[in-house]
Amino acid sequence: CMFSLKTGRTIPVYLVDEEIYAKCPTVIISTVDKFARLPWSERVGLLFGRTDRYCSRCGHIAIGEKHAGRHNADVAAGLEKAETVACKQFYPPELIIQDELHLITGPLGTIYGGYETVVEEMCCIEKNGKKIRPKYIVSTATIRNAGEQIKFLYGRNEFAQFPPSGFDTRDSFFIKEVPLPTENLVDASEEKISRMISDGKKPFRQYAGICASGQSVKTTLIRLYSIILQTALDIAKDPEYEDYIDPYYTLIGYFNSIRELGGAVRLLDDDIASRIRVVKNKYNSSEQRYLSFEGKKEITSRIPSWEIAQVLEKLAISYDKNKKKQGCYDVVIATNMIAVGMDVDRLGLMSVVGQPKQNSEYIQATSRVGRQHPGIIFTVYNPYRPRDLSNYENFVGFHSQMYRYVEGTTATPFAARARDRVLHALVVSLLRLQVETMADNGGASNINDISDEQIKDIKDKILERVKITAPSSYVDTEKEMDEFINTWKNIAKDEKLYYFVPTIADDKKRLLTYYGEYYGDKEKPTLSSMRDVEQSSTVFYWEGV
């Protein structure tokens, strides 16, 4: 390998933002959360090839970025002298691949769609008087009204779908409906069963609905978990089936909220363990299943990311009947974090408590099991919730054609409240990344020095997207941009203005401030992340004396 240690070279993979900017890599893997950094730094332009200088010590320098022409040697730090030389710009990204499109919806999709205006504009190139835009490839397994979603997010009225709609619902290219074998497989040879599995003739996932009228969901959950866990151990002790129990020895519990999951944590520590003893005595099992502390884990937002990675890695550990190595998990409970990214082929058993808010979430979550081996999902419905009861009554019909019930996704990038959050950020981003004198942090003061044509060009690029995605908001969008730019010009007339300074000083005024921080009348709160785009409110209850 050309990157082996013998050659003294390392793999050219960079993780820190500043390193990525300096190297201008060919391939960038990122989350959409990074879009929020567009108005905050001129160095973001390096991701789009906007460089005009190269420093042998610091890497590529962004257009408009202030940088020393040379660096003296630093013997103590082991650094040689370095010079900055001129270089050509790179082409911007030509291909953008977006995975899990169905997740970019609601508030996140609305904010994302706004910033996508800047991303696409920065990826465009002019050739022979023609504007060449980047190509998008987006993937999703569960989406409806994809054309509308693509128009709102990417401003494209036309798109090609692969695979296209077929002639037979039993074959959609990625999924084929295979009838279950009619012959008795109990006495079938192991060779025959293996051949059927290799041919793909096996059931994929089986769904079972449970709705216990007159009982609480917690009671149902206690009884379901205890019988599943104890039965798995009983089967594991049977010599005839001990080699096939692995996919069903670890139970994945799926919950719709942290509150519901928190109740299940307490049940696992107490009630379920006690109920397992009852089940063992009732069915005269040879051995009781005990749930150790290490055998119970959760995958939620309240668990550190490094610990989640360890849990996912250990989930791949198979059941060891001889117990000569570290055992697999007994129960792993989770929220919708596992709906994306948990790819463990050995899993085959899941319990879902309550119908998720979106059917696409239900499909994505339950598809975590039954990948390599036949899977079974137990869905526990709350009889006191009308929606759960309705889904239970239509259980067979719904599960026979789940993809027909996927809801359409929504995104409104230029709605009134969305404009409050991102419209000014789009203006700042395009000015900093496309006008050289506006790029530097102190360039915010130069708003009065650039021509009206340059400002109009920036506005037109945003309004062009508004025409496609939200034509009814065109007038309001133009008016609000004019108001923001006029306010910006008035502030810059009186004093030196910066885009952002970490702390408010008497001699430094800033145009932007972090969203959620204290800000003055002349500062514009701006998102620095899209991880929490919905602002929370604190409610106080006061009782008078």
Regions found by a protein language model. Give the residues of each.
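SF2 helicase catalytic motif II
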Residues: 25, 33, 47-69, 87-125
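The feature captures the C-terminal accessory region of ATP-dependent helicases
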Residues: 390-408, 425-545
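A short beta-strand element within the Helicase C-terminal
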Residues: 338-354, 375-379
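Cys/His-rich short segments
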Residues: 1-16, 49-87
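Conserved interdomain linker/interface between the two RecA-like ATPase lobes of SF2 helicase motors
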Residues: 134, 144-152, 157-271
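Conserved helicase ATPase core of P-loop NTP-dependent helicases/translocases
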Residues: 303-334
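Conserved segment of the helicase C-terminal RecA-like domain
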Residues: 328, 368-402
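Conserved helicase ATPase motor motifs in RecA-like P-loop NTPase domains
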Residues: 100-110, 119-151, 164-165
